[in-house]
Amino acid sequence: MTEPVAAEVGRDFIRDIIQADLDQAKYREIVTRFPPEPNGYLHIGHAKSIALNFGIAQEFPGRCHLRFDDTNPVKEEQEYIDSIQADVHWLGFDWGKNLFFASDYFDRLYEWAETLIRDGLAYVDDQTQEEIRTSRGTLTEPGKNSPFRDRSVDENLDLFRRMKAGEFPNGARVLRAKIDMAAGNINLRDPVLYRILHAHHPRTGNAWCIYPSYDYAHGQSDAIEGITHSICTLEFEDHRPLYDWFIEKLPVPSKPHQYEFARLNLTYTLLSKRVLTQLVREGHVAGWDDPRMPTMAGMRRRGVPPAALREFVKRIGVAKANSVVDVGMLEFCIREELNRTAQRRMAVLKPLKVVIENYPEGQTEELEAINHPDDPSAGTRKITFGRELYIEQDDFMENPPKKFFRLSPGNEVRLRYAYFVKCTGVIKNESGEVVELRCTYDPATRGGNAPDGRKVKATMHWLSAAASKPAEIRIYNQLFANPSPDASNFAADLNPQSLEILSNARVEASVAESNSTEPMQFERQGYFVRDKDSTPGKPVFSRTIGLRDTFAKEVAKG
């Protein structure tokens, strides 16, 4: 299990409210909660809520509950419950013994529903879902009372108990709160509290065939658990009067209060569950953990460090108004963390063979390479140098422009940790493509410096042809080419270059043979992580992020 991390202390309007509540001795302990519905995978927007709620509980201190809002058995699966718990732990937080489910409270919620009926505050409605929707009115027109609104308490209790007993089919009846069909806030126009749903529940089995609505279950679950600050995103602001109405009318054991903050919106990103589901179902991505997905599973597979996500959430802060955050800020946080923690290795993504003609045939030597330039404790490793090497295709040009300083005919460059080499010949295939270079090396320049003081303007990475291993490299870019993709027609904004697969790459032998899932920097290329699709003899590495933002520049150029 992941060790809990220390919360980053940051000031915002929610923390200011909590501090004021503590200063006034309003609460002895702060209790927050993260309440996901187990009907899908968490995404980066949820990471903001997780870090906020768990961070507050650590900072003040207090406790944060993980509570699953499992009130819709048709959409909920154990797979999602497991993945959500794994995501919270991966992000660096732990709920300890405070794991709860809304279904834990089904009996009490039912009893309180009967309380509302007895108090004349709820009734059974026989209207269809469409009739209820139509009769609620609009923002400018009041709703119309249901013809069943004035049923007696006894009749409502009888019908509600028969609903619970399973006498009626799905959709035949609902239980509604009796509030005000002319209320300016449509959420107060007799909202549905219970609906009939004959479906197997992951935890309660077939014990229930009526299920509470989110609006009814949510606040009462908070009250049962002693939540002091119920923090949610802005789309629930209009639901707060209903939240408070239930708390006021029912004999709940505590009086929580709801606070709203701005949800996370990112450029080049859509977080709608509908869109993410379509992306998976329609085959635009290879599953919920596809590294292009904004899901936490996708980011974890891509090698994004959880510390980078926590830092990103800290930087964007907690606000009252919605805004769009440039994805470049997230990428900056990822690069900063990986630059600090990732060990360095060498990989050649598009190999071009080099033969060092004056290097003895059959001879090899071991050179020392540093694992991290800023962390001496990371140590060094041995890399093999020999007569035949690989360099990047892009590091050679036969007819280079004026400011191209890498390898070209007659030009000398430094091979990192090795020697100066000079290109003396070019071999092409029948199509005129360069397939091999002939070079010479200067034995006196071992380690990268010339005794005579001559300088070179380029240092290139390389690999031994004999000592390196084949690998598949997956270069991921933004899933959408449009910085503001259209959720209603997202397919039109998909980036056709979001994935490039390089099947003939080469990596250091130790990299190919290691099963480590820690991200590493392939020097001059970017940060990469071993993918779960790796097989014996054919490792697969996914790019977490490049060393610099090139995608935005390509988009700008059109």
UniProtKB/Swiss-Prot annotation:
Belongs to the class-I aminoacyl-tRNA synthetase family. A motif ('KMSKS' region) lies at residues 270-274. InterPro entries: aa-tRNA-synth_I_CS, Gln-tRNA-synth, Gln/Glu-tRNA_Ligase, Gln_tRNA_ligase_bac, Glu/Gln-tRNA-synth, Glu/Gln-tRNA-synth_Ib_cat-dom, Glu/Gln-tRNA-synth_Ib_codon-bd, Glu_tRNA_lig_a-bdl. Keywords: Aminoacyl-tRNA synthetase, ATP-binding, Cytoplasm, Ligase, Nucleotide-binding, Protein biosynthesis. GO terms for cellular component: cytosol. Its main location: cytoplasm. GO terms for biological process: glutaminyl-tRNA aminoacylation; glutamyl-tRNA aminoacylation. GO terms for molecular function: ATP binding; glutamine-tRNA ligase activity. PROSITE patterns: AA_TRNA_LIGASE_I. This is Glutamine--tRNA ligase. It catalyses: tRNA(Gln) + L-glutamine + ATP = L-glutaminyl-tRNA(Gln) + AMP + diphosphate. It comes from the Bacteria. SUPFAM superfamilies: Nucleotidylyl transferase, Ribosomal protein L25-like. The keyword Protein biosynthesis applies. A motif ('HIGH' region) lies at residues 36-46. The keyword Aminoacyl-tRNA synthetase applies. Its EC number is 6.1.1.18. ATP binds at residues 37-39, 43-49, 233, 263-264, 271-273.
